[in-house]
């Protein structure tokens, strides 16, 4: 991984009055570019081949310029071009997937957030340690398939976007479905409602929901639309579907907005606070947007089953603000909140605290 000292040395050569916000043209790029423009930043889209035409349909979110590459890994070879643009890169899920973790960690361009959190987020053992040390409720895990005594969800390592999962109601069904030779995690299947909670942690802002250092925002909540799990049971029972050779899948195709019972908000902020404070102890802390993927049971308890330590696609629902972010600032999106953090850090001479 490129060192923080090397990144700060590169940043020292920037014209800070002319910072460019850059990201890969995918995932949440429309929101990121739109938010950056709202805060007065120049924007730069990184794409493979010709610039995507769909940006022409969304002029308020079309980047001011593009860098066209032959492959995403070519970003490392083109880092000097990005540096010449005074670029700060905003990572998102697609960028990390396309570029690869090792290449992302080595990219010699100032990047918003703490790159060290990626190792903790992407490794299921480390992620679980993080959550357990934070003291939040997590699903029970089975180390041995012989111990399965309830419905479970099985996640292959590296699963993302709803792929790489299956549900088994007992150990016999697990044995019939498991793909040998792949690493996997077995968790109890929690009955409840899924809430994907969008947070933003600022280590430099003082006004708001205070932590030991900085503040925590809760900007929105969504749930995922999954194909074909959200529609499949309209055509028959589980047994009828299995008899016909039809099985549920969980590929994410979209997102729906949600609001919580107001009485649950203290629990939400407690979850976010615990995860942030523990991240500071473990690896120096997350910076910026992150999401806790949770299930709320009928006892109104939260079970946290995953962390995404960057902007998530569910925030795209709220480009013009959410029921929660509107109570912070009218029309505030996560993309704009990122740009605001960079602008604030620049004005304070504290960019080193929010980039890596």
Swiss-Prot record:
Protein name stated in the entry: 5-formaminoimidazole-4-carboxamide-1-(beta)-D-ribofuranosyl 5'-monophosphate synthetase
One function term, GO molecular function aspect: ligase activity, forming carbon-nitrogen bonds
Region forming the signal peptide: none
Top EC class for this record: ligase
E.C. code: 6.3.4.23
Classification via PROSITE patterns: ATP_GRASP
Binding positions (ATP): 145-196, 226
Cofactor(s) listed: Mg(2+); Mn(2+)
Keywords noted in UniProt: ATP-binding, Ligase, Magnesium, Manganese, Metal-binding, Nucleotide-binding, Purine biosynthesis
Chemical reaction(s) catalysed: 5-amino-1-(5-phospho-beta-D-ribosyl)imidazole-4-carboxamide + formate + ATP = 5-formamido-1-(5-phospho-D-ribosyl)imidazole-4-carboxamide + ADP + phosphate
Positions contributing to 5-amino-1-(5-phospho-beta-D-ribosyl)imidazole-4-carboxamide binding: 27, 94, 255
Family under the similarity heading: Belongs to the phosphohexose mutase family.
The protein's annotated pathway: Purine metabolism; IMP biosynthesis via de novo pathway; 5-formamido-1-(5-phospho-D-ribosyl)imidazole-4-carboxamide from 5-amino-1-(5-phospho-D-ribosyl)imidazole-4-carboxamide (formate route): step 1/1
Cofactor binding note: Binds 1 Mg(2+) or Mn(2+) ion per subunit.
Domain ATP-grasp stretches: 116-333
Protein task: Catalyzes the ATP- and formate-dependent formylation of 5-aminoimidazole-4-carboxamide-1-beta-d-ribofuranosyl 5'-monophosphate (AICAR) to 5-formaminoimidazole-4-carboxamide-1-beta-d-ribofuranosyl 5'-monophosphate (FAICAR) in the absence of folates.
Domain of life: Archaea
HAMAP family associated with the record: IMP_biosynth_PurP
Any one of the GO BP annotations: 'de novo' IMP biosynthetic process
Binding positions for Mg(2+) per the UniProt entry: 293, 306
Species for this entry: Methanothrix thermoacetophila (strain DSM 6194 / JCM 14653 / NBRC 101360 / PT)
PANTHER family: 5-FORMAMINOIMIDAZOLE-4-CARBOXAMIDE-1-(BETA)-D-RIBOFURANOSYL 5'-MONOPHOSPHATE SYNTHETASE (PTHR38147:SF2), 5-FORMAMINOIMIDAZOLE-4-CARBOXAMIDE-1-(BETA)-D-RIBOFURANOSYL 5'-MONOPHOSPHATE SYNTHETASE-RELATED (PTHR38147)
